[in-house]
């Protein structure tokens, strides 16, 4: 039986298995609240009364300014992890509301389109079932993968896409970090002789595809609907680049899945 880790970093790299340290950052706080069934109950009630208004959006932004969003060294205790506080729930609700109600989910600019928060509540219940036994790590992805990688494990990475680096200013993920990411994962692949499998998702960028292939990784372009463009351009498509250290099509067939 393989252990699974989910980790959260400002660079948005996510691994598969679930063991983590909790930091009082915005995404981490949300995950921690979802994990605790008592907190989740309060959160669902709070979000059910959510108001999609510009004033509420600005109030949430002001609330979240005081919440740290850096890789702090926080010493965890069971009390920190399990204590339910109304402040945690309010911050989690404010963060989720501003992700849903903002333009392009940046949390910074109010989006005019009406959105019903109640439609998101079943997703939170699903998230609870998936991560209730997880520990959420908030560390640099290289530190987490070095710690967690072992034969038989699988790692999923969802880094900032090429051209969106400015949206992750607090993560210090500039354009050079793409090359660093691939070099690091190549080292992981060699160190574990290919017994640690990983999948990286990107936008279909020629430079990224070239770097991936230079390291000998398999690539596949997956076409799907571009959800952010459907209101103005129905049927608009988006090309997602899948990168792995294994044969993607062969593995998909083994799992009775099909890439197109």
Where are these regions (language model features)?
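Conserved glycine-rich SAM-binding loop
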Residues: 1-6, 160
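Conserved SAM-binding loop of SAM-dependent methyltransferases across substrates and taxa
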Residues: 4-15
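Hydrophobic "anchor" residues on beta-strands that sit immediately upstream
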Residues: 17, 154
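Conserved small/polar residues in nucleotide/adenosyl-binding loops
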Residues: 22-28
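Polar, low-complexity loop segments and adjacent catalytic/binding residues used for recognizing
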Residues: 29-138, 143, 147
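Mobile active-site "lid"/loop adjacent to the S-adenosyl-L-methionine
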Residues: 109, 113, 160-180
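Glycine-rich phosphate-binding loop signature in dinucleotide/nucleotide-binding domains
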Residues: 148-152
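Long, positively charged, glycine-interspersed low-complexity recognition regions
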Residues: 175-260
């Amino acid at each position: 039986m393989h252990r699974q880790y989910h980790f959260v970093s400002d660079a948005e790299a996510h691994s598969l298995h679930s063991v983590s340290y909790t930091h009082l950052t915005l995404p981490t706080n949300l995950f921690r609240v979802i994990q605790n069934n008592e907190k989740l109950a309060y959160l669902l009630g709070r979000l059910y009364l959510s108001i999609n208004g510009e004033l509420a959006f600005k109030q949430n932004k002001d609330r979240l300014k005081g919440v740290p969003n850096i890789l702090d060294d926080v010493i965890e205790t069971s009390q920190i992890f399990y204590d339910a506080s109304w402040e945690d729930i309010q911050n989690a609700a404010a963060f989720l509301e501003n992700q849903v109600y903002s333009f392009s989910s940046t949390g910074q600019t109010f989006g005019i389109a009406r959105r019903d928060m109640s439609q998101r509540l079943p997703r939170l219940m699903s998230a609870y079932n998936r991560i209730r036994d997880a520990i959420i790590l908030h560390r640099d992805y290289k530190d987490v993968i070095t710690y967690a990688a072992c034969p038989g494990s699988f790692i999923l990475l969802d880094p900032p896409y090429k051209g969106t680096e400015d949206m992750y200013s607090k993560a210090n993920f500039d354009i050079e970090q793409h090359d660093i990411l691939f070099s690091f994962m190549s080292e992981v692949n060699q160190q574990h002789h290919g017994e640690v499998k990983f999948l990286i998702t990107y936008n279909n960028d020629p430079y990224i595809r070239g770097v991936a292939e230079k390291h000998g990784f398999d690539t596949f372009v997956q076409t799907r609907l571009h959800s952010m463009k459907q209101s103005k351009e129905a049927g608009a498509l988006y090309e997602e680049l899948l990168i792995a250290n294994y044969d993607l099509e062969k593995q998909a067939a083994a799992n009775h899945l099909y890439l197109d």
